[in-house]
Amino acid sequence: MNSAARIEAFLEMMSAERGAAENTLSSYRRDLEDASSGIDGGLAGAAAADIRAYLDDIAERGFAPTSQARKLSAIRQFFKFLYAEGLRTDDPTGTLDSPKKARPLPKTMSEAETGRLIDRAAVEAGDAGLGYSDRLAALRLHALVEVLYATGLRVSELVGLPVTVAQRDDRFFMVRGKGDKERMVPLSAKARVAMRAWLAARAGVPAFADSPFLFPAASDSGYLSRQVFARDLKGLAARAGIASAKISPHVLRHAFASHLLQNGADLRAVQQLLGHADISTTQIYTHVLEERLVRLVNDHHPLAD
């Protein structure tokens, strides 16, 4: 039985025994036939080295890591079938590693865009012409944005902050993050001012009087939901002339980290501020460091153009 016949037998099994959809079968067929045509002697008799060479070839042809991984998955399934049917005495895919997916760079905002966003929040918070509920919402949003950009907190950490953070008015506070680990977070003067303004407005809402949270709400958790904050943030961005699709609380956290690194912060310090347990998580920002080094050389090297 040649490779083409064995591929057909595999597809028949996938259809009859596993109920694979037509689209799934078509995808398997394309991937297996492409592999078979790319390997001398066909796929069914291939050794591990042959399959590895094929994977190297499609990588050089520009296939994305996700496409490479999908093709390898189809090949693995094919050889499991051959082994189970007694058509192979080994599985050559057992020693092959899946292609590593490139970690996407985090979305972020420029310093100018972030400045526009925060300035807009400040203007709205100071608008005496707003009605009571709108003014309350504007003061809350201004405090949220200032604190998020000043600290780089995770959105879940931000919305669940205790009211004591604002009452103490300290330059630092402790936050409990992932894995129940605590870390010290600095607060800028602007963030403290925005929090105090919100705290004063919050004190005038009887429903909030007994809440232990800085941003209380009538929710199951007792504090503002991440979804409501994300919605309000997108609305603020649109009013600041920034595409709302470009922004989220997570993007503002990334802006905090990127802007620190652009202005000379150490990667380890940023790791601690973000609450990353492993430096490898923070290393998604190394592109910022690389850009900074290029600028440094271009600006200061005596022979730079």
Curated annotation (Swiss-Prot):
SUPFAM superfamilies: DNA breaking-rejoining enzymes. Pfam families: Phage_int_SAM_1 (PF02899), Phage_integrase (PF00589). The active site is at R154, K178, H250, R253, H276, Y285. InterPro entries: CB, DNA_brk_join_enz, Integrase-like_cat_sf, Integrase_catalytic, Integrase_recombinase_N, Integrase_SAM-like_N, Recomb_XerD, Tyrosine_recombinase_XerC/XerD. Residues 1-83 form the Core-binding (CB) domain. It is found in: Cytoplasm. Residues 104-298 form the Tyr recombinase domain. It comes from the Bacteria. The keyword DNA-binding applies. One of its GO terms (biological process) is cell division. GO terms for molecular function: DNA binding; tyrosine-based site-specific recombinase activity. Its main location: cytoplasm. Forms a cyclic heterotetrameric complex composed of two molecules of XerC and two molecules of XerD. HAMAP family: Recomb_XerC_XerD (MF_01808), Recomb_XerD (MF_01807). Belongs to the 'phage' integrase family. XerD subfamily. Site-specific tyrosine recombinase, which acts by catalyzing the cutting and rejoining of the recombining DNA molecules. The XerC-XerD complex is essential to convert dimers of the bacterial chromosome into monomers to permit their segregation at cell division. It also contributes to the segregational stability of plasmids. This is Tyrosine recombinase XerD. It comes from Mesorhizobium japonicum (strain LMG 29417 / CECT 9101 / MAFF 303099) (Mesorhizobium loti (strain MAFF 303099)). The gene is xerD.
